[in-house]
C-alpha cells in the first residue's frame, strides 16, 4: 500500500504535464507532404479527394498570361478570381482538422 501512495502524486504530475489531446493539432499551415500526411491521418480508410491539374491543362498558357497582364479575360474591375482549393486554404492560410475532413471521400 505504501508504494501506491508514492505513485499517485507522480502519476498526477505526469497527467498535468501531458499535452491535452484537443490542443495537439491546432490550426496549422500544412504544405506539400505534410498536407498529404494530415489528410491520410484525418481521412483514414475513406481516402481523400485529389485530382491534380496544372493550370495549363485547364486553359491555354496565353490565357493565363493575358489575365496576369490585365488583358482580355482578366475579369475587368472584379480583381483576381478567388481560389478555394485545399492548398490555398491550408498552405497559404491555416486550417483545422474539421476543414481537412471536408476533403475526405
UniProtKB/Swiss-Prot annotation:
Protein purpose: Insulin decreases blood glucose concentration. It increases cell permeability to monosaccharides, amino acids and fatty acids. It accelerates glycolysis, the pentose phosphate cycle, and glycogen synthesis in liver.
Record-level GO BP terms: cellular response to palmitoleic acid; glucose homeostasis; glucose metabolic process; positive regulation of protein secretion; response to L-arginine
An example Gene Ontology molecular-function term: insulin-like growth factor receptor binding
UniProtKB keywords: Carbohydrate metabolism, Cleavage on pair of basic residues, Disulfide bond, Glucose metabolism, Hormone, Secreted, Signal
Location in the cell: Secreted
Official protein name in the record: Insulin
InterPro entries named among the record's database cross-references: Insulin (IPR004825), Insulin-like (IPR016179), Insulin-like_sf (IPR036438), Insulin_CS (IPR022353), Insulin_family (IPR022352)
Protein species of origin: Ovis aries
GO cellular component, one term: extracellular space
Amino acid at each position: 500500500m505504501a508504494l501506491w501512495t508514492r505513485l499517485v502524486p507522480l502519476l498526477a504530475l505526469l497527467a498535468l504535464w501531458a499535452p491535452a489531446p484537443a490542443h495537439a493539432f491546432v490550426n496549422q499551415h500544412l504544405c506539400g507532404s505534410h498536407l498529404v500526411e494530415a489528410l491520410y491521418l484525418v481521412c483514414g480508410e475513406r481516402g481523400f479527394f485529389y485530382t491534380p491539374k496544372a493550370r495549363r491543362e485547364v486553359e491555354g498558357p496565353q490565357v493565363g498570361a493575358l489575365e496576369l497582364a490585365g488583358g482580355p479575360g482578366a475579369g475587368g474591375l472584379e480583381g483576381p478570381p478567388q481560389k478555394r482549393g485545399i492548398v490555398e486554404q491550408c498552405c497559404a492560410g491555416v486550417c483545422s482538422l474539421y476543414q481537412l475532413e471536408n476533403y475526405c471521400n
